[in-house]
Amino acid sequence: MIDYRDRHILSLLQANAEMPLAEIAERVALSVSACSRRVARLREEGYIKGTIALLDRKKINLPTTIFLLVKTGLHTGNYLEQFHAAVSAIPEIVEVHRLTGNFDYILKLALPNVEYYDVIYKQILKHVAFYDMSAYISMETVKISPALPTNYI
């Protein structure tokens, strides 16, 4: 059972995964050992899936974001497996979501520049055919947050 302290721990770790356990314990009013047990349980139960380093996209030369809307035309199991494998194999495709509506998927690409989109486009087409694709260049990132709200658990 998740309580308010667990939610607070999850929020603190999302804000700073390197926060010392002693500081987390102090903020949630627990002993370090009790806090450590809670963090271990949250990991064990799958609430914490892992810890990653968030990189500065400009510093690693991936400042361009392009969203690609895709209509597949086919919805057979074999085609969808091929599609999922193809997009999973391209590291510049950082998110893929299946949609309702006029398009089947939206892909988020992290690229060094707009011109590099053509390279990715051709890579995708080598593996799967599409009915339609539309690309949209992000002009500005207004909000980006990997942190999820914890008040729903």
Swiss-Prot record:
Output the superkingdom of the source species: Bacteria
Domain named HTH asnC-type is located at 2-63
Q: What GO MF annotations does this protein's record show?
A: sequence-specific DNA binding
Q: Which UniProt keywords apply?
A: DNA-binding, Transcription, Transcription regulation
- What GO cellular-component annotations does this UniProt entry give? cytosol
DNA-binding residues per UniProt?
21-40
Q: What are the GO BP annotations of this UniProt entry? A: response to amino acid
The protein's name is HTH-type transcriptional regulator Zrp
Q: Which organism is it from?
A: Zymomonas mobilis subsp. mobilis (strain ATCC 10988 / DSM 424 / LMG 404 / NCIMB 8938 / NRRL B-806 / ZM1)
